[in-house]
Structures are given as C-alpha cells and as structure tokens.
C-alpha cells in the first residue's frame, strides 16, 4: 500500500465510489462520489489526537467487532492514506424529533465521559434552557429513542437537567459578552421561551437585542405559569441571567402596545413572543360566581407571591399540565380534598403521564368521563357544581374519540373552589391593532418565515401556535431569529427552508445488553405538602454517567465538536459535503471483492448467541500481533481456551445457502490450527471438514504436517453447537455435535471455542455494481467473465475487466495472477491505441426508424442513443455486441444485424429446406 501511495502515476481516491459510467472502450466517463470525510486531507497529519478526545465508541470493522474505535478514527496504523475519517451516518432520531434540534446524542456522549461542562456547552449551542427543558420539556425525543426497542428509552430530559444542575452546584462563572458586530437593532416583545430563544440566537449572531416584558420579572409562562416544585426560580433565574450576560438587554414592567414606538426607537426588526395568557371559559351557567378561578390567573398569583385563599374542597376541570399543576398547587396551599374532572379517559389526558401519577400519589382524585354543566351558587358565591357523565363516541377532528353526554347521568358535588383549566387563548387587547389574526384568534404569520402581515415584524410561540409546550416555543424563536437575520442581511427569507435533517436509516442493536433506565429520585411525600420544594431531585454523577452509557450512538459522530479543540492543524470540517468528480478513462478494472457469509442465519451454530463462537476473520484478528489482544488467544471471560473446534464449509457446499466451494476455507482453517498449536501447545484442536481441498503449491504438505502435529481431523459437517451439557466434562463448555462419517457415529465434542470457516459470497451491492458497469452475473451471484478459459478477466463490455473474488472465490496467489493479467490487458490497449470490435453489430435503417426509443431501454450494453435532430435511434458500433435484442424487438423492422440481413437469413433457410 505504501508503494501505491507513493507512486507518481497512481491517484488514490479513497472513501469514494463510482456511481455512473458512460461511454465505451477507450472513452469512458466515470462519475465518482467522493464521500465527505470531514477531514481536510491536505492538513491532517495523522496524529490521532482527535480520536483520544472523541466520546463515541463504535465496533471496529478492522478488528471484526472484537474491539472498539472512535467516531473519528484512523482504521489501523498502516492505513493509506494515514488520515482520520469522521463516521457520520445521518442525524439521530432524538435530534430529528426535537423541534429545536437540540443535539441530545452530543451531550449524552460527553456525560458518559464525565465531561459535564462540555456537555452543557453542546446544549447551549442550540438554546440556553438546559435546566428549564431538563425539567418541563415534554421530551418527544424519548418516544423516538432507538434504545426503547431494546429495553427503555434513554432518560434524555433528565440528563439535560443533570448538566445544568451540575454547573449551578459547582458555581457558574459569568458568561463572556458576545461582541456586537451588527448595527441593526432588534426588539423582542415578551420574555417567555420563544422571546428569550430568539434573543439568544440573535445576540449570538452579533445583533444588539432588547427584550420588552410587561410583567415585573422575565420568564413569561415559565415563571408565572409553572409551579416552583417543578421549575425552581433559581434555575430559571440562572438561565435568564446567562442570556443577559451575553449581551441581551431585558426591560421589565415595559408593555408594548404600538409597533411604531419601537420603530421610532430605531429597532429595525421586531419579534412578538407574548404567549397565550387568557384562560378560556367553559360557557356554563354560574361560571362568573365568586370562588371560580382560572388556572393561569391562579398559578400567576401563586408564583408572584400573592396571597391565595382556597377552601377545603377544590375541583379542577381539564386534563392538561395546567390542570394537574393547579391541583397539586391547591394541595400545597392547604386544600383538604382536590379533584380533577376530565371529560375523556385517563390515557387521553394531555398532561405528562408522570405528572398525573405524582398528582395521584400526592392525593389528587381524578374523575374521568365527566364534565361540569353548571356552577351552583348562593348569593353569588360558589357552593357546588353539577356534572354529567360522558361516554366516548366516534373520533373527532383530533383523532380522539368524542366524549358524548349520557342522558340522565347528572350528579352534583359540593365544593369551595372551581379552577378552570380547559385551554388558553391569545390576549388580543395587549397586541398592536394593525396585526392580522387567524380564525382561531392567533397571530397570522408565514408558516415558513414567521413573518406577520407587517414586513420586518415576526412572531412565534403560543401567540401563533396557541398553547403548546416549551420546546415548541423555543424552536419558533430560533426560526424567527433565522428569518430576522436574513431580513436584516437582505437574504431571501424562504430559500432552503424548512431544513430537513436526514435521519439515520438503520441502527444496529446487535449485542446490546439490556440495562435498567435510571430512576429519578423523588422528594418524600411528607415533605411535599405545605411546601413548594422541588419534587424531582435529579441524578447523581455516577447514575448520570451510567445512564449516558446506555446510548446507542445512533448517528456515530455525535457532533460534540471536542475534536476541534485538539486539532492543531485545523483539519476538521464538520460542514464538509460530498463531491461528484468526473474522470475520463480508457479501461476499467472491477475488483470489488467479497463479503463474508453471515453465520448467524445458521441458528444451530450459535453465532451471536454464544460469546466464544467466532468467525475465521475474527480469529484472524485475535491471533494477529496488531489485533485487539496483541496476538494472545483469550475467551470472552479472559481465560485461555484448552480446546478449540474449527468448522469448515459454513455457508458453502450447502444446498441451503451456497452450493459452491469457497476455495480458501480449508487452507486458512489449517493455518489456524498451526497458529493455535504455537500459541496454545497444550490445547486440543479439532478440524471438522467435509472434504479437505488443498489444491495449491505446498498445501498438501502443510496438511500432512498438521496431522503429524496432532490436530484431530473429523470428517463430517457439524450439526449443532450447544451449551447444554449431558455429562460432567461438558459442563461450562460449548458442545459441537457432529456425525463422524469415517466411523459412522455421532460425536459430542466439548470445546471452549468454536471457529467458523465462513463462505465467501458476493457483496451486497453486487447488483448495483453490475448495472453501473454493464456486467452480467452468474447463478451464484459473482460477476461473469467473457470466457472461463480463453478470456477469464475480460467481460462482455469491452474495456471492463473483473479480477479477484468479485469474479469467483479464490486465494491470494490466484487473485494476484488475475490482477496482473487484467493490468496487462489494459496496458496492451493503451500501447496499441486501437481495439477490435465485433463484426456482427446491429444496424439501423433510418428510413424505417419510427423513433419509438424502445430499443434504447432494452439494450444491455447502452449502445443505442437517440439523435434528436434526425429523430431516429443510432447505434455506437464500438459498444454494440451484436446480441440481437434490438433486432428482435424493433416494431418497425428498422434494425438488422450486420452480415445477417433478412435476405441472407431467408436465403439460408430456403437453401436448407429446398
């Protein structure tokens, strides 16, 4: 490889694949996809410092999965070129599902390494709310987590909270202000999650940003709508302070009612993130009675520190988080009996299931399939409610079954307070009058850009979407920041949006051991009531690290960007894209090799189920001095094996899989026996073979030598490998069951390790390769040569040669000989300068050609094209092989074979018959 690399006439295009070939012998055009390595090869020094800090470990392909490598890696020390590669397989499901695109795999990977502050930096590249979202996010990411298909989803939200809490406990350092590089001022109206997220993104881009908040403190519904036992003020304050420290100015007690005010102050773009603060009414009699409270008003008063007096009996109507929060707050304020009434079933409650469970645990009663129809009062004061029972009917527009009242099922409840939590709406009175609204009362904006009917004015969050979760509001703020940046920079607001993340297509779960998801420690029940102390206590360091290690690293590279910090050559480029390169070549040599037969499909051999059943390639790496064990042979538990069985013809010479002989298995199985004899001289070695095929120079002599060395040869195909013992000597062993055809009896051979000599089979993409290079395939799937004896390296496509195991299984000497032959053929064509073509090519009579183009699609050699000017098909004689497909299918009879005209053929037939 080193000689190839240093040869001045050889250009190595690694990490590349041919995607299209056109033209003909001597004049091929090849399109090559050069995959993104994410490394500038001209800068990379191969120092491998990047892999040392990479937190992601993956199975090493070079060591056949027996060891690990990093997501940024050099495959092996002698790799050519000796440059790193970043393994990116798409975006992980958690990141794709997150509305804000938070890189969960990135911070989880760093947590697994104990790099907690670095993990927090990963979250802050996207948003400033690790502590907030670590507590109140609806964690849609967890519902898509691939780990859930193994045991339970990753505790993504909890891990995010952990790194935020870790910084708070360690003492957060003040953030360094971001330099303002832009002159255009931006105003943000509303300091909720949407407004702060928008401000955060814009200040990160260098804009001077001011946030206007009507209430005394920043935070919006995060502060005034979520109780402290779920979101402590110190956590929210810390993250708002972080945004301030970066350079965002926040003005509280400053309502904005006219956009012109902001324009007059020099603001060139405005974002409205004022939320949905108005509680919806039920529209039932007596709803305005004293003692009826709206949930948002109730929570706002409590969170503001105002005195709130409740009676002993409180009913909350609704099934969302606001309803559950109100019920749990009522208990903490001293209510003796708190009941949630919800008109649908328990499973259809939109509140987080964990919050509902905790509410019940604290003593909240949940009355499902019921709905208040009337508020009972005396002298204007609430005394009770009248409800009706419901049943579920046909699905409504939301897809849920519609609740239908049951006639005659009315009942009453005596209560002291009723808290309404059935929905929220936008407060239009607090917004500028010139804005346009939708039929649902929310602000009307462009669905892609977030721009309102007024140019330069954008909106997002609940004021646009209606009541939604925090992370949706954060995402809206981020999208608005992108739009504002484009607007102020004079760039098209819509181009390239919305951006679609390419989700990783397949995540291997092979060999993943089930582990219990980390449980969240909870505050004792007796410490909750009468107190607003946080209920969820958070994970400790050890638990967080162990939980993070459960991650499957779906996308390989987590894009944590730790590698950038240590690369002194600045060779890493995570934004690199693949290239399509076109090259002109005269000939093509196809040497795509083979793939190893997957022995796990032969279930009875136990590969993938028993740790000490390995393939031949895996043992090759185990026995190599550069392998994962430095050449020492160990079992999975660290012991050295005392007995080893080597099974021949696994997947080959088998009617159920491949009928052909793989040719190399016998010899490498014998080589393994010799290596084992050297490394483990006292071990018992068994060779289980059908026929020993040692056809090569010195091969038979080597076979005889191993017989003399004491290797046990048993003629017969193994029927099963099991760990079920039938005698004391089989305890703790693998038992190979085989019929010894020489002595005609079944044998049970207890061994410590079994090595499977697997078949060589065509690569999985062989069909695609065949289409690209116009190759034919044999019945066994390997590429078909032009003639097995007279032309074993050429194909039916002139100038295209096949060599090595892609043509048929063969050993290294035969592969080298075939490769040399193909090289000689290619060089001969170059030196000669001309090629001989088939004499019997097809010819098109342009007068008869109808231009139907049927022949073009049928030609297996792509020899026919269409002349747009003449409107007829034409044949390239240099490519045509005279196969006759086009002649037989031409509906107008315009195509004939040269030297095989219709007149000639008819005359020949007539001569035979007459």
PLM regions: where:
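Residue-level detector of alpha-helix initiation sites
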Residues: 49, 128, 192-193, 320-322, ...
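Phosphate-coordination loops involved in phosphoryl transfer and adenosine-cofactor binding
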Residues: 15, 41, 182-185, 253, ...
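A conserved FAD-binding loop/helix module that cradles the flavin
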Residues: 326, 463-488, 589, 656-667, ...
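Long hydrophobic segments that form regular secondary structure
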Residues: 311-344, 406-417, 423-425, 440-441, ...
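Beta1-alpha1 glycine-rich phosphate/pyrophosphate-binding loop at the start
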Residues: 1-6, 70-71, 93, 99-112, ...
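A Rossmann-like FAD-binding core segment of flavoenzymes
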Residues: 4-36, 40, 232-280, 293-310, ...
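FAD-site-proximal beta/loop scaffold in flavoenzymes
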Residues: 60-82, 290-312, 395-467, 509, ...
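Non-heme iron-sulfur electron-transfer modules
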Residues: 1, 13-43, 55-93, 102-128, ...
């Amino acid at each position: 490889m080193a000689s190839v690399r240093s040869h001045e006439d050889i250009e190595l295009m690694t990490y590349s694949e041919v995607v299209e070939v056109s033209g003909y012998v001597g004049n091929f055009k090849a399109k090559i996809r050069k995959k993104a390595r994410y490394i500038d090869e001209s800068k990379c020094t191969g120092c491998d410092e990047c892999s040392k800090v990479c937190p992601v470990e993956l199975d090493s392909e070079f060591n056949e999965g027996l060891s690990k490598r990093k997501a940024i890696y050099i495959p092996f020390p002698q790799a050519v070129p000796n440059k790193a590669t970043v393994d990116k397989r798409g975006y992980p499901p958690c990141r794709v599902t997150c509305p804000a695109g938070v890189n969960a795999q990135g911070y989880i990977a760093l947590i697994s390494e104990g790099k907690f502050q670095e993990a927090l930096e990963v979250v802050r590249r996207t948003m400033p709310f690790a502590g907030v979202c670590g507590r109140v996010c609806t964690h849609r990411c967890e519902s898509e987590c691939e780990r859930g298909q193994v045991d339970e989803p990753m505790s993504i939200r909890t891990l995010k909270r952990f790194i935020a809490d870790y910084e708070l406990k360690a003492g957060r350092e003040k953030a360094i202000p971001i330099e303002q590089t832009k002159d255009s001022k931006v105003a943000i109206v509303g300091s909720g999650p949407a407004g702060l997220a928008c401000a955060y993104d814009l200040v990160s881009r260098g804009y001077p940003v001011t946030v206007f908040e009507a209430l005394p403190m920043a935070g919006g519904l995060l502060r005034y709508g979520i109780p402290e036992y779920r979101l402590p003020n110190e956590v929210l304050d810390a993250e708002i302070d972080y945004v301030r420290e970066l350079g965002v100015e926040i003005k509280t007690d400053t309502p904005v009612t006219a956009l012109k005010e902001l324009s007059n102050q020099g603001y060139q773009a405005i974002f409205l993130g004022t939320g949905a603060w108005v509680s919806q009414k039920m529209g039932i009699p007596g709803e305005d009675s004293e003692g009826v409270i709206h949930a948002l008003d109730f929570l706002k008063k409590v969170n503001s520190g105002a005195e709130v007096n409740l009676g002993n009996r409180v009913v909350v109507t609704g099934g969302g988080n606001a309803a559950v929060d109100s019920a749990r707050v009522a208990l903490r304020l001293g209510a003796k009996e708190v009941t949630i009434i919800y008109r649908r079933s328990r499973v259809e409650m939109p509140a987080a299931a964990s919050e509902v469970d905790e509410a019940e645990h604290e003593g909240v009663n949940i009355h499902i399939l019921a709905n208040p129809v009337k508020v009972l009062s005396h002298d204007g004061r609430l005394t009770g409610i009248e409800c009706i029972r419901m049943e579920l009917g046909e699905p409504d527009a939301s897809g849920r079954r519609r609740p239908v009242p049951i006639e005659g099922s009315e009942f009453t409840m005596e209560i002291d307070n009723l808290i309404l939590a059935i929905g929220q709406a936008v407060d239009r009175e607090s917004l500028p009058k010139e804005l346009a609204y939708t039929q649902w009362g929310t602000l009307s904006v462009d669905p892609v850009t977030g721009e309102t009917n007024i140019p330069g004015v954008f909106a997002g969050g609940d004021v646009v979407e209606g009541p939604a979760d925090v992370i949706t509001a954060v995402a809206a703020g981020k999208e608005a920041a992108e739009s504002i940046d484009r607007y102020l920079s004079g760039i098209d607001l819509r181009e390239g949006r919305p951006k679609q993340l390419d989700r990783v297509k397949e995540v291997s779960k092979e060999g993943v051991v089930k582990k219990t998801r980390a449980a969240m420690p909870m505050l004792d029940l007796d410490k909750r009531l009468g107190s607003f102390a946080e209920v969820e206590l958070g994970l400790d360091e050890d638990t967080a690290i162990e939980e993070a290690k459960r991650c499957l690293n779906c996308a390989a590279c987590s894009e944590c960007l730790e590698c950038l910090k240590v690369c002194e050559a600045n060779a890493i480029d995570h934004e690199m894209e693949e290239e399509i390169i076109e090259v002109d070549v005269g000939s093509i040599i196809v040497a795509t090799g083979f793939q190893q037969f997957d022995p796990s499909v032969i279930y009875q051999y136990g590969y993938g189920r028993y740790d000490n059943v390995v393939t031949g390639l895996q043992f090759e790496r185990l026995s190599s001095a550069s392998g994962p064990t430095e050449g020492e042979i160990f079992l999975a538990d660290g012991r050295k094996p005392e007995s080893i069985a080597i099974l021949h013809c696994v997947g080959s010479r088998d009617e159920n899989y491949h009928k052909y002989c793989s040719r190399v298995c016998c010899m490498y199985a014998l080589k393994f026996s010799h290596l084992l004899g050297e490394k483990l001289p006292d071990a018992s070695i068994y060779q289980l073979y059908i026929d020993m095929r040692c056809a090569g120079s010195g091969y038979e002599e080597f076979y005889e030598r191993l017989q003399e060395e004491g290797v046990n040869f048993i003629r017969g195909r193994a029927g099963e490998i099991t760990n079920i013992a039938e005698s004391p000597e089989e305890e703790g062993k693998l038992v190979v069951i085989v019929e010894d055809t020489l002595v005609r009896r079944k044998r049970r051979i207890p061994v410590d390790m079994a090595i499977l000599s697997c078949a060589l089979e065509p690569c999985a993409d062989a069909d695609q390769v065949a289409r690209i290079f116009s190759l034919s395939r044999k019945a066994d799937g390997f590429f078909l040569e032009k003639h097995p004896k007279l032309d074993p390296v050429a194909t039916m496509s002139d100038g295209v040669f096949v060599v090595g195991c892609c043509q048929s299984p063969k050993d290294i000497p035969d592969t080298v000989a075939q490769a040399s032959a193909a090289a000689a053929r290619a060089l001969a064509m170059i030196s000669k300068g001309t090629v001989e073509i088939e004499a019997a090519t097809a010819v098109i009579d342009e007068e008869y050609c109808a231009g139907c183009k049927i022949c073009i699609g049928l030609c297996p050699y792509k020899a026919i094209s269409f002349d747009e000017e003449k409107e007829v098909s034409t044949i390239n004689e240099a490519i045509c092989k005279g196969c006759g497909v086009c002649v037989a299918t031409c509906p107008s009879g315009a195509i004939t074979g040269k030297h095989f005209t219709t007149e000639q053929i008819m005359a020949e037939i007539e001569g035979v018959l007459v």
